[in-house]
Curated annotation (Swiss-Prot):
Annotated protein name in UniProt: Urease accessory protein UreD
Source species: Aliivibrio fischeri (strain ATCC 700601 / ES114)
PANTHER family documented for this protein: UREASE ACCESSORY PROTEIN D
Family membership: Belongs to the UreD family.
Gene Ontology cellular component terms for the protein in this record: cytoplasm
Subcellular location per the Swiss-Prot or TrEMBL entry: Cytoplasm
Length: 287
């Protein structure tokens, strides 16, 4: 594994958002920010749910840059966060960029963490960390989508590296701890790695139930076998696992749009299962 150089030569972007239930709505009651990470004012296409767009630096992330994102959802609050576009990690001359996400949801709180994909350019060096802290009565659905190289341009991730660590805890009990290490094209080719697929996605859902798991398994089977046009002709791989009340869906593919379509479909039906109706899909995804 190459040495990770966390040089301070880049800029620091740090944002903390605190959501609370106020009357019938969820409000962004406090924010702290340093650097170019920012949010638009929350809006309410659905009653009681604060939709928020997290705006990443428009110029992308370069070596030495640090992004820190902290989200706190109080009891009975309900927040949905997404991004207006992909987060791009550009080539590095030696310093490692980092993105750290800390997501906390209290009792009866509800967080939907739905960012668009990360794109890692060849020769980029990046370190990703995600820490999710949930109360046992919280609801959480979140995903991460990572693209190594730019397959649409036949550009492969020949050099560089990306490391990742995701921890999910419920009432301070660790349910999931997994790491990712991608070191150029060799790891993408390896059968124990990504099997020649340049895109890797993970979708996390808590709490799980047998009924919800069965519903999502059926959706995956129907979409892959009966609607292949939805997922393109690149033969993606998608599977679902239950871990101590947490559902984990993993996806390997060649294109962003099919992965987004898959995860969006599973998210919408999960929300319907929990709340009895389909959600309003963020309009920014259609632009």
């Amino acid at each position: 594994m190459p040495k990770i150089n966390t040089s301070s030569s880049g800029w620091l972007a740090d944002i903390s958002l605190f959501y609370e239930k106020r009357g019938t709505n969820t409000k962004l009651v406090h924010r702290e920010q340093v650097g170019p990470l920012m949010v638009q004012r929350p809006f309410y296409p659905e009653t009681g749910i604060a939709h928020t767009y997290l705006l990443h630096p428009p110029g992308g992330v370069v070596g030495g840059d640090q992004l820190n994102i902290n989200i706190h959802v109080s009891p009975q609050a309900h927040s949905l966060l997404t991004t207006p576009g992909a987060t791009k990690f550009y080539r590095s001359s030696g310093a490692t960029s980092s993105q750290t996400q800390n997501l906390t949801v209290e009792s009866d709180g509800f967080l939907e963490w739905l960012p668009q994909e990360n794109i890692f350019f060849p020769d980029s060096q990046a370190q990703l960390k995600t820490q999710v802290e949930l109360h046992k009565n919280a609801h959480f659905i979140g995903w991460e989508m990572n693209c190594f190289g730019r397959p649409v341009l036949d550009e492969i991730f020949e050099n560089g590296f990306v490391t990742g660590r995701t921890n999910i805890k419920v009432d301070d009990q660790l349910l999931l701890s997994e790491s990712m290490y991608i070191d150029s094209i060799d790891e993408i080719k390896h059968a124990a790695g990504m099997r020649h697929y340049p895109m890797l996605g993970n979708l996390y859902i808590y709490p799980a139930s047998e009924a919800l798991e069965e519903k999502l398994r059926t959706l995956i089977d129907e979409n892959f076998h009966e609607q292949p046009e939805l997922f393109g002709s690149s033969n993606p791989i998608c599977g679902i696992t239950e871990i101590d009340g947490l559902l984990v869906i993993r996806y390997l593919g060649h294109q962003t749009e099919p992965m987004m379509a898959c995860f969006s479909t599973l998210w919408q039906h999960t929300r319907q299962h929990w709340l009895g109706k389909l959600p309003e899909v963020p309009r920014i995804w259609a632009t």
